[in-house]
From Swiss-Prot:
<feature type="binding site">
    <location>
        <begin position="30"/>
        <end position="33"/>
    </location>
    <ligand>
        <name>ATP</name>
    </ligand>
</feature>
<dbReference type="InterPro" id="IPR001844">
    <property type="entry name" value="Cpn60/GroEL"/>
</dbReference>
<dbReference type="GO" id="GO:0042026">
    <property type="term" value="P:protein refolding"/>
</dbReference>
<keyword id="KW-0413">Isomerase</keyword>
<keyword id="KW-0547">Nucleotide-binding</keyword>
<dbReference type="InterPro" id="IPR018370">
    <property type="entry name" value="Chaperonin_Cpn60_CS"/>
</dbReference>
<comment type="subunit">
    <text>Forms a cylinder of 14 subunits composed of two heptameric rings stacked back-to-back. Interacts with the co-chaperonin GroES.</text>
</comment>
<keyword id="KW-0143">Chaperone</keyword>
<feature type="binding site">
    <location>
        <position position="495"/>
    </location>
    <ligand>
        <name>ATP</name>
    </ligand>
</feature>
<feature type="binding site">
    <location>
        <begin position="87"/>
        <end position="91"/>
    </location>
    <ligand>
        <name>ATP</name>
    </ligand>
</feature>
<keyword id="KW-0963">Cytoplasm</keyword>
<dbReference type="GO" id="GO:0051082">
    <property type="term" value="F:unfolded protein binding"/>
</dbReference>
<dbReference type="GO" id="GO:0016853">
    <property type="term" value="F:isomerase activity"/>
</dbReference>
<dbReference type="InterPro" id="IPR027409">
    <property type="entry name" value="GroEL-like_apical_dom_sf"/>
</dbReference>
<dbReference type="GO" id="GO:0140662">
    <property type="term" value="F:ATP-dependent protein folding chaperone"/>
</dbReference>
<dbReference type="Pfam" id="PF00118">
    <property type="entry name" value="Cpn60_TCP1"/>
</dbReference>
<protein>
    <recommendedName>
        <fullName>Chaperonin GroEL</fullName>
        <ecNumber>5.6.1.7</ecNumber>
    </recommendedName>
</protein>
Length: 548
């Protein structure tokens, strides 16, 4: 085991503070509409230019082990805020830096760190309640566009396109962000349920122009096993043929004799039919088949529930207004499922999303939810260069997360005003002793830090702006974009309540832990030269010639 170096008390805290300040100073320059860019060197390819706080934080690794510990703890604040609300990483970092700097001054002056921590916790709990009181619902398209614009660093085109996407697919719908091919941003909307499986044979194609299969008012057979024997399918094919409607088969696979017979029947016009593989694998495939069944009003033919393909009736088949199948995708439009059953399925998936601990599972459940409840919108980001594309795509993703957070918990005045208002309401808050009171005042003072930093990045004097905003009431605040004061909501400067709340809670949590640090332990750096192989021994290799 490697030898360790241990630092205690103020020496340890000062080292940690230095790391905190290096990381926070690098991140906080990006805050606000006049925030600056940070250039990140990459070992491969061109440098990356970003205004995304968490991207900057992730790049920072310090040589000194003790300083690095401080930096990594603040990096955790940014990551947690990003995971919880998808935005607010820079605000969280600025708050954490302010709490740690103020807190360590008080500890150095001889105050009890544990009482300071209790005071900070008390102030944050009260501030979160105040934020909830001043929060307003964010329901209309205009407010959504404003939130997205602010999060995308005042880019109105991004705000508008996200608002359009939410209008089209609803608040439950899935919105994905991709790199586009054009110079401008584009929005593609897929209505109905789409999954990434195409036709099993090109002989099913009936629209030669688009190279797709189009079925109007088809029956839909859902089965969770492979079909290779055509005899199993004959009763269904006969029933569908008599009804004079097309048939879509969604199965684990259709192969051999069964597929060949379907192709021949389709080409001869005996029955209009197409087959695709079921989406997903394993348990996820079963769940998605059940989703399609609920959406189309059908039943999944499964031996697990005692159903056999030979005994399947027309009543067991789902129906939809239209199905379009391309080489890669199948889209079911206007399934004829029962609305109550669909709502029940949606609620079931929402419950699973709450229960799961896996981010991957949650993402897949969100996709399934969107396909049932709304639709899928794809924002294709346009830019002139690859460097600009990457930077812009990151901003669009941030804006999308912020918008979802706003819809979830509402909005508060932006530009750091909400935290200033919450702090001013808590001027009378008291702890159990004087040191807790210092902790409370310390946290309330730190809550002004984001506003001061936004002003400083815009070239204004932070203290003057903070005093002017404190003198106002309600939504009155400072618009750093054009250096004016006024009603933040009327000027369209909004922050999602969830983003502001998460930033404050995570910053206070980690900041208070750092204040209470009394010892730090790290590996002693190894001297690389000391471990080198002695050069003299290799001389003996010359004698190997005598072996020949």
């Amino acid at each position: 085991m490697a030898a360790k170096e241990v630092k205690f008390g103020n020496t340890a805290r000062q080292k940690m503070l230095k790391g905190v300040n290096i990381l926070a100073d690098s991140v906080k320059v990006t805050l606000g509409p006049k925030g600056r860019n940070v250039v990140l060197d990459k070992s491969y390819g061109s440098p990356v230019i970003t205004k995304d706080g968490v991207s900057v934080a992730k790049e920072i690794e310090l040589e000194d082990k003790f300083e690095n510990m401080g930096a990594q703890m603040v990096k955790e604040v940014a990551s947690k805020a990003n995971d919880e609300a998808g935005d607010g990483t820079t605000t969280a970092t600025v708050l954490a830096q302010a709490i740690v700097n103020e807190g360590l001054k008080s500890v150095a002056a001889g105050m009890n760190p544990m009482d300071l921590k209790r005071g900070i916790d008390k102030a944050v709990i009260a501030a979160v309640e105040e934020l909830k009181k001043i929060s307003q619902p964010c329901a209309d398209s205009k407010a959504i566009a404003q939130v997205a614009t602010i999060s995308a660093n005042a880019d109105h085109t991004i705000g508008e396109i996200i608002a359009q996407a939410m209008d089209k697919v609803g608040q439950e719908g899935v919105i994905t962000v991709e790199e586009g091919q054009a110079l401008t941003d584009e929005l593609d909307v897929v209505e109905g349920m789409q999954f990434d499986r195409g036709y099993l044979s090109p002989y099913f194609i009936n629209n030669q122009e688009s190279g797709s299969v189009e079925l109007d008012n088809p029956f839909i057979l859902l089965i969770d096993k492979k079909i290779s024997n055509i005899r199993e399918l004959l009763p269904v094919l006969e029933g569908v043929s008599k009804a004079g409607k097309p048939l879509l088969i969604i199965a684990e696979d259709v192969e051999g004799e069964a597929l060949a017979t379907l192709v021949v029947n389709n080409m001869r016009g005996i029955v209009k039919v197409a087959a695709v593989k079921a989406p997903g694998f394993g348990d996820r495939r079963k769940a998605m088949l059940q989703d399609i069944a609920v959406l189309t009003g059908g039943t999944v033919v499964s031996e697990e529930i005692g159903m056999e393909l030979e005994k399947t009736q027309l009543e067991d088949l789902g129906t939809a207004k239209r199905v379009v199948i391309t080489k890669d995708n199948t889209t079911v439009v206007d399934g004829n499922g029962d609305d109550t059953a669909i709502d029940g399925r949606v609620n079931q998936i929402k419950q699973q999303m709450e229960d799961t601990t896996s981010d991957y599972d949650r993402e897949k459940l969100q996709e399934r939810l969107a396909k049932l409840a709304g639709g899928v919108a794809v924002i294709k980001v346009g830019a002139a260069t690859e460097m600009e594309m990457k930077e812009k795509k990151a901003r669009v993703e941030d804006a999308l997360h912020a918008t979802r957070a706003a819809v979830e918990e509402g909005v508060v005045p932006g530009g750091g005003v909400a935290l200033v208002r919450a702090a001013s309401k808590l001027a009378e808050l008291r702890g159990d002793n004087e040191e807790q009171n210092v902790g409370i005042r310390l946290a309330l003072r730190a809550m002004e830090a984001p506003l001061r930093q936004i002003a400083m990045n815009a070239g204004a004097e932070g203290s003057v702006v903070a005093n002017n905003v404190r003198a106002g009431e309600g939504n009155y605040g400072y618009n750093a974009g054009n250096d004016t004061y006024g009603d933040m909501l009327e000027m369209g400067i909004l922050d999602p309540t969830k983003v502001t709340r998460s930033a404050l809670q995570f910053a206070a949590s980690v900041g208070a832990l750092m204040i209470t640090t009394e010892a730090m332990i790290a590996d002693i750096p190894q001297d690389d030269n000391a471990g080198g192989m002695p050069g003299g021994d290799m001389g003996g290799m010359g004698g190997m010639g005598g072996m020949m």
